[in-house]
Amino acid sequence: MNKTEFIAFMTDHGHNHKHASHKTLTKAEAEKALNLVLDSVISAIKSHHNINITGFGSFEIHHRKAREGRNPKTGAKMKIDAYNQPTFRAGRKMKEACN
């Protein structure tokens, strides 16, 4: 599901919600809310802050050291620079919902 499909899913009045008090959003409201959350996560990770949302999961940044690798086509050695890798680890509720 891409971002546009997810926004449509968020605004779908026909799918069943667990809570009767769930207020549906317009597409514009859903897009604005999603963009705000995504921009905030990116900004926090960029500032080297970990984000833990109980039950949902955690966003973290892992530093990868520089290392030597190989070009898979030629087999030639090459240097891979150090970089920061953003990661997501699913929380218990997320894992349980998938199984």
Curated annotation (Swiss-Prot):
Any matching Pfam family: Bac_DNA_binding
Keyword check for GTP-binding: no
Entry-linked SMART domains: BHL
Alphabetical UniProt keywords: DNA condensation, DNA-binding
Matching InterPro entries: Hist_DNA-bd, Histone-like_DNA-bd_CS, IHF-like_DNA-bd_dom_sf
Domain of life of the native organism: Bacteria
GO BP annotations listed: chromosome condensation
Region Disordered: start-end pairs: 67-86
Molecular function via GO: DNA binding; structural constituent of chromatin
Subunit structure: Homodimer.
Family membership noted in the UniProt record: Belongs to the bacterial histone-like protein family.
UniProt function note: Histone-like DNA-binding protein which is capable of wrapping DNA to stabilize it, and thus to prevent its denaturation under extreme environmental conditions.
Protein name: DNA-binding protein HU
Annotated source species: Rickettsia conorii (strain ATCC VR-613 / Malish 7)
Gene from which this protein is expressed: hup
